[in-house]
C-alpha cells in the first residue's frame, strides 16, 4: 500500500489539459491561409515549454508528500518520506490512566503520620486518656452510678483539652471521640447511661468495661479496659488483655488481617475461668472486630475479627488501628439489646437533605456543625440545650441520614471483658499511643 496520496480524477483532467490539441486558439486564423513555419516553430516550442513547466510543478508537489512505492517495493523509504515524518500508528487509549497503584495512592494519602502536629496531637489525646482512666480506676467502686462515671469521664476529657465544646464547631476541634461506653457483665459493648433512664449502681459482683475515646482534629484515641471487684473474674480479664496485646504485637506493615485474627483467637481460647464452681472456656466474640481509624471516622473500613478467617487484606504503613478484643463466658456471639447507645451522621449522606420535618432540618444542621461524623449520644445534645429532638432524630434515622447504634449483649448470666489499644504503623516501628502502666 502506498504511503502517498492518489491523484483524483480532477487532477488527471487538469494535468491532461496541458496536452490539448490547441482548441479554438489554433483554428481562429484558419480560413485556408498558409501557416508561417517560423511562427509554427515558435508556437510549438512555447507549448513544449509549458508542458515541461507543468511536469516540474507536479514533481515539486510530490516531493512534499510521501511518494508511490514501486511493486515490488525497491525505493528507499527516506526517498519516499524525505521529511522523516512517517505515518503514526494506531492509538489505543489506556483504560486506566493512573500512573500510581492503589496502594501507592493510599500511602500518599497517609503522609500525615510524618507530620509533627499529627503525632503531637495523637500523643496529647493519649495522655488525656491515661490521666482520665486513672481517675476511673480510683472512682469506679460498688455503689457509684454509671451516669456519674460517664459524666465524670467526659468532663475530665473536656477539662484537660481546655475545650468545653459548647460553642458551635468547638467539639469538632477536640472532644470525645464517641460516647463513653460502660458495660456490665453480659453487656458486651455500646451501653451508655442516657438522660431519663433508671440509675444503675455498680455492684460487688459486677464486671465493668470502660470504653471511651479522645479526639483532636478528628484523630481518635480509642482505648478500653475491664475491671472487676471480685478476683473470681481475674482469668477472664487476663485472657482478653493477653489476646489484645498479642494482636498488637502481631500487627505490622504487610501483615495479613487473617494472621492477626488467628493469633488473637489462639491466645484467648487458651484461658479458662471458674465461676461459682463451673469452668468456662473464654470465647472470642465472633461478630465483633477491631478496626482502622480515619479522621473523624472511628471505623475506617478495615476490620480485624477475633477468630480465624480468610481475609488476605494487609495492614499498610501509616495506618492507625484500634486493636480490641472481646471475650465472653457465654455463646461468644452478640445480639442487639434494647435502648439506644448513640447516633452517627452517615458520611455518605448528602449535605442538603430533603426532609419535610422542620425539627429534622434543624437537628441535621446542629449535628453537622457540632459533631460531623463523630458518634454522639443524647447527653451531648442536651449539653447544647437541644430540646424536643426525638421526632427529628427518628426522621433522620428513617431517611438514612443518621445511623442509630444500640447496646450489644451476650446471653444473660454470662460475663464479658474488653481491652483495646490504638497504635500507628510507622516505617520502622509501631507506636502504641494508648499504652499505659495500667494496661
Swiss-Prot record:
Its Enzyme Commission number(s) read 3.4.11.18
Q: Which residues bind a divalent metal cation 2?
A: 222, 291, 324, 420
Q: GO cellular component terms? A: cytoplasm
Q: Where is the composition biased (Acidic residues)?
A: 22-32
The subcellular location is:
Cytoplasm
Cite the binding residues for substrate: 190, 299
Q: Where is the composition biased (Basic residues)?
A: 47-61
Q: Which domain of life is it from?
A: Eukaryota
Molecular-function annotations in GO: initiator methionyl aminopeptidase activity; metal ion binding; metalloaminopeptidase activity
Q: In which residues is a divalent metal cation 1 bound? A: 211, 222, 420
Could you give the cofactor binding note from the entry? Binds 2 divalent metal cations per subunit. Has a high-affinity and a low affinity metal-binding site. The true nature of the physiological cofactor is under debate. The enzyme is active with cobalt, zinc, manganese or divalent iron ions. Most likely, methionine aminopeptidases function as mononuclear Fe(2+)-metalloproteases under physiological conditions, and the catalytically relevant metal-binding site has been assigned to the histidine-containing high-affinity site.
**What keywords were assigned to this record?**
Aminopeptidase, Cytoplasm, Hydrolase, Metal-binding, Protease
Q: Which GO terms describe its biological process?
A: proteolysis
Reply yes or no: does the keyword NAD apply: no
Catalytic activity annotated for this protein? Release of N-terminal amino acids, preferentially methionine, from peptides and arylamides
Cofactor entry = Co(2+); Zn(2+); Mn(2+); Fe(2+)
Enzyme class, UniProt record, top EC level: hydrolase
Predominant localisation class = cytoplasm
- Physiological role: Cotranslationally removes the N-terminal methionine from nascent proteins. The N-terminal methionine is often cleaved when the second residue in the primary sequence is small and uncharged (Met-Ala-, Cys, Gly, Pro, Ser, Thr, or Val).
**Which family does the record claim for this protein?**
Belongs to the peptidase M24A family. Methionine aminopeptidase eukaryotic type 2 subfamily.
Instruction: Give the protein name, as stated in the record.
Output: Methionine aminopeptidase 2-1
Q: Which species does this protein come from?
A: Chaetomium globosum (strain ATCC 6205 / CBS 148.51 / DSM 1962 / NBRC 6347 / NRRL 1970) (Soil fungus)
Amino acid at each position: 500500500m502506498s504511503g502517498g496520496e492518489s491523484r483524483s480524477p480532477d487532477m488527471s483532467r487538469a494535468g491532461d489539459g496541458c496536452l490539448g490539441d490547441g482548441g479554438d486558439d489554433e483554428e481562429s486564423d484558419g480560413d485556408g491561409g498558409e501557416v508561417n513555419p517560423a511562427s509554427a516553430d515558435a508556437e510549438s516550442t512555447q507549448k513544449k515549454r509549458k508542458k515541461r513547466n507543468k511536469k516540474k510543478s507536479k514533481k515539486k508537489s510530490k516531493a512534499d508528500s510521501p511518494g508511490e512505492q514501486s511493486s515490488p517495493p525497491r525505493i528507499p523509504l527516506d526517498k519516499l518520506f524525505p521529511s522523516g515524518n512517517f505515518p503514526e500508528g494506531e492509538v489505543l487509549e489506556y483504560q486506566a490512566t493512573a500512573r500510581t497503584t492503589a496502594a501507592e495512592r493510599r500511602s500518599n494519602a497517609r503522609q500525615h503520620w510524618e507530620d509533627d502536629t499529627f503525632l503531637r496531637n495523637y500523643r496529647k489525646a493519649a495522655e488525656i486518656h491515661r490521666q482520665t482512666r486513672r481517675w476511673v480506676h480510683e472512682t469506679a467502686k460498688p455503689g457509684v452510678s454509671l451516669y456519674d462515671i460517664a459524666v465524670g469521664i467526659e468532663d475530665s476529657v473536656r477539662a484537660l483539652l481546655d475545650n468545653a465544646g459548647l460553642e458551635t464547631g468547638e467539639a469538632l476541634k477536640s472532644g470525645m471521640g464517641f460516647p463513653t461506653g460502660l458495660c456490665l457483665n453480659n453487656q458486651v459493648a455500646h451501653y451508655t447511661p442516657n438522660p431519663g433512664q433508671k440509675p444503675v449502681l455498680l455492684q460487688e459482683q459486677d464486671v465493668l468495661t470502660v470504653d471511651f475515646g479522645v479526639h483532636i482534629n478528628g484523630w481518635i484515641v480509642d482505648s478500653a479496659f475491664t475491671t472487676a471487684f471480685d478476683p473470681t473474674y481475674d482469668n477472664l480479664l487476663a485472657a482478653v488483655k493477653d489476646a489484645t496485646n498479642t494482636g498488637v504485637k502481631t500487627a505490622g506493615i504487610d501483615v495479613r488481617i487473617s494472621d492477626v485474627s488467628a493469633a488473637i483467637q489462639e491466645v484467648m481460647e487458651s484461658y479458662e475461668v471458674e465461676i461459682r464452681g463451673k469452668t468456662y472456656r473464654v470465647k472470642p466474640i465472633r461478630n465483633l472486630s477491631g478496626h482502622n481509624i480515619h479522621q473523624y471516622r472511628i471505623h475506617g473500613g478495615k476490620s480485624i475479627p477475633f477468630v480465624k478467617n480468610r481475609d488476605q487484606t494487609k495492614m499498610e504503613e501509616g495506618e492507625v488501628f484500634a486493636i480490641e478484643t472481646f471475650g465472653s463466658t457465654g455463646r461468644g456471639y452478640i445480639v442487639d439489646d434494647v435502648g439506644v447507645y448513640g447516633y452517627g451522621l452517615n458520611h455518605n449522606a448528602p449535605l442538603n437533605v430533603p426532609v419535610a420535618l422542620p425539627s429534622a432540618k434543624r437537628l441535621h444542621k446542629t449535628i453537622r456543625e457540632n459533631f460531623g461524623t463523630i458518634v454522639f449520644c443524647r447527653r451531648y445534645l442536651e449539653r447544647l440545650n437541644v430540646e424536643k429532638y426525638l421526632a427529628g432524630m427518628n426522621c433522620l434515622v428513617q431517611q438514612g441520614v443518621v445511623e442509630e447504634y444500640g447496646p450489644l449483649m451476650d446471653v444473660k448470666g454470662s460475663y464479658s471483658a474488653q481491652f483495646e489499644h490504638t497504635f500507628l504503623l510507622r516505617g520502622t516501628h509501631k507506636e502504641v499511643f494508648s499504652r499505659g502502666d495500667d494496661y
